[in-house]
Amino acid sequence: MGNTVIEKIIRHNTGKDVKPGDIVTVNVDRVMIHDIFIPFVGDKFEEMGFTKLWDPDKVVLIYDHLVPASQLDDTRHFHVGDAFAAKYGMTHVHRSDGICHQLMTEAGYVKPGDVAFGTDSHTTTYGCVGAFSSGIGYTEMASILGTGTMWILSLIHI
């Protein structure tokens, strides 16, 4: 059986052939953080001791889950996110520009062959443009922000 699209993307990204069940460290092309998770990502990033983003141009912060704010605490997420973006030089910050996953593909942040992660389970929708993508938690996102890498498990063929 030939390689799957995901295996081809991983091979292009890492320069290594993978087989089902392999754990591989990939170089991340793009990440998306949405407004609900930014306070947790920011806290964990600094707790891990990172002092700069691996590549601010590859990080996208999108305010969409809490827009418009329905509770006073929602606005805290906006203030924390704006402060984090300013402190670490993030230039891709979107406020009320649309649903995060549609924006990531329609604005060209994610392209065919990319490896992308986001703080939402629907991040897998980036496969619609031929990318490998996965939703992750705030600890994994904080680690990516500092290192630019992430481990993945090559899936078993069915």
Q: Where do the PLM segments sit?
A:
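Short, flexible turn/loop "capping" segments at secondary-structure junctions
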Residues: 18-19, 152-154
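Conserved small/polar residues in nucleotide/adenosyl-binding loops
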Residues: 156-158
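Class I SAM-dependent methyltransferase SAM-binding "motif I" and its flanking Rossmann-like core
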Residues: 142-152
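N-terminal amphipathic, basic-rich helices that act as targeting or association modules
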Residues: 1-54
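Long, structured ligand/cofactor-binding scaffold of large enzymes
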Residues: 31-143
